[in-house]
Design a protein with these regions (language model features):
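Single-stranded nucleic acid-binding surfaces, predominantly the OB-fold ssDNA-binding core
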Residues: 1-191
Length: 191
C-alpha cells in the first residue's frame, strides 16, 4: 500500500521499578510530525500482535504492539501498562510451582481479529488465577486483564553454556471464563 512501518522499543516502568521493554510497530503516517527521540515520554494505544520469525535455525514468536495512536505524555499514569484480551485457549494450560513456591500457569491464547487472522499470545497467571487455569480446556473463551511484560531468563544451551534471553508475555491480574450466561448478561444492569 506504499505505507512504511517503523519498529522501536519502549521502556515502561512498573510500580516495583522494574522496567518492561516493549516492542512497538507504527505506521509512518502516525508519526510524521512527532519527536520520538530517545527519552521522550509517549502514550501508545494499540493492538497486541504476534508473528513467527525464523531466527537462528528455528521459529520464534514475536510480540509487538501495533500502534493505533501515539501522543506525547503530558501526565504520567499510575498504571501505565494495561492490556485486555478476549481469546481462546489453544494449548492446554501448564500449571507449576516455581523453586520459590509461587504458583503459576502458562496459557497460550488465540485472539481473533479481522480477515480471519489470529494472534497467539503467551500469558502467565499467578496464585489463585493459576489454579483457576487448571479448570480451563482447549477451546474455552476467556477474558484477561493485565500488563504486557518482558522477562529476562537464562537458557541452558549445553552443560557449560547458558544464554540470556527475553520472554514477552501478558501477566494476568484478572481473568474470567466467557459463558453463554455471561454473554447474555452483558449490558443488562440489575435493578
Amino acid at each position: 500500500y506504499g505505507e512504511g512501518f517503523y519498529t522501536f522499543f519502549m521502556e515502561v516502568t512498573r510500580l516495583s521499578d522494574s522496567v518492561d521493554l516493549l516492542n512497538i510497530t507504527v505506521s509512518e503516517r502516525l508519526i510524521s510530525n512527532m519527536d520520538l527521540s530517545i527519552g521522550k515520554e509517549i502514550i501508545v494505544l494499540g493492538q497486541l500482535r504476534s508473528y513467527n520469525k525464523f531466527v537462528d535455525g528455528s521459529n520464534k514468536l514475536i510480540l509487538t504492539v501495533f500502534a493505533r495512536n501515539i501522543e506525547p505524555c503530558i501526565e504520567k499514569s499510575k498504571n501505565p501498562n494495561e492490556i485486555f484480551l478476549d481469546g481462546y485457549i489453544c494449548k492446554e494450560p501448564v500449571y507449576r510451582k516455581t523453586p520459590f513456591g509461587r504458583e503459576i500457569a502458562d496459557v497460550l491464547l488465540a485472539v481473533n481479529r479481522a480477515y480471519n487472522k489470529s494472534d497467539y499470545i503467551p500469558t502467565i497467571a499467578w496464585g489463585r488465577n493459576s489454579r483457576f487455569c487448571q479448570t480451563l480446556e482447549v477451546g474455552d473463551n476467556i477474558r484477561v486483564w493485565g500488563r504486557l511484560q518482558s522477562r529476562e531468563y537464562q537458557k541452558k544451551i549445553s552443560e557449560t553454556e547458558v544464554v540470556k534471553k527475553i520472554a514477552y508475555e501478558v501477566s494476568i491480574s484478572k481473568m474470567e471464563r466467557v459463558t453463554e450466561e455471561s454473554l447474555n448478561n452483558e449490558g443488562h444492569e440489575d435493578t
